[in-house]
Amino acid sequence: MPIKKPCLKLNLDSLNVVRSEIPQMLSANERLKNNFNILYNQIRQYPAYYFKVASNVPNYSDICQFFSVMYQGFQIVNHSGDVFIHACRENPQSKGDFVGDKFHISIAREQVPLAFQILSGLLFSEDSPIDKWKITDMNRVSQQSRVGIGAQFTLYVKSDQECSQYSALLLHKIRQFIMCLESNLLRSKIAPGEYPASDVRPEDWKYVSYRNELRSDRNGSERQEQMLREEPFYRLMIE
């Protein structure tokens, strides 16, 4: 006599209901796109921001000799096996995540030490919105290396809100900070370096350029350039 097997039927309808009730997680970039107009209008309501310039800052030859030292709240690290000198704020002002947004500053090779002297008061400023940055040790790179002819400074931007978002105030401070860096270099008649093919910049930026390192690569391309120019963070910096 054949044994009757129980009829087991999986109720897929109930699974579909559960799945449909789970909200789709937006990426940090998508959230920034969705909030673009709000942030754009809020940024324009803030007055000009004036950064307190740090005093008693090290010069370029000093940081090339340091191994690890604390200066103006920044830990400076210079390892012999690295072509970069790294600076990281001990108590970060922005508590969010790094979502790939960064700036390069490109200087003529022979003027990098002077450019550092001009910018160091801002880079070490307690008002600086940049918690982490690095600079090329020019003694360790070849004449024509990518970070020898340009992109000697890298400024890393961190978010300050939940879900890796930026507040309008932080975006405003970053915009103003970039303007100060540019104007200080221009006023001192520093010669620009070769800005990276991987980056984008508006016509009025002579030294600073932008890249999101999570959605681009170092080689660059027309497609990548177009994509970076459409990045909401970049647009909020220049528009």
UniProtKB/Swiss-Prot annotation:
Pfam families: VRP3. GO terms for molecular function: lyase activity. Catalyzes the removal of the phosphate group from the phosphothreonine in the mitogen-activated protein kinases such as MAPK2/ERK2, MAPK3/ERK1, MAPK8 and MAPK14 in an irreversible reaction, thus preventing the downstream phosphorylation of histone H3. This epigenetic modification results in inhibition of the transcription of a specific subset of pro-inflammatory genes, and ultimately to a reduced immune response against the invading pathogen. The diminished immune response enhances the bacterium's ability to disseminate and multiply within the host. Keywords: Lyase, Plasmid, Secreted, Virulence. It is an enzyme of class 4 (lyase). It comes from Shigella dysenteriae serotype 1 (strain Sd197). Its EC number is 4.2.3.-. GO terms for cellular component: extracellular region. Belongs to the phosphothreonine lyase family. This is Phosphothreonine lyase OspF. It is found in: Secreted. The active site is at H104, K134.
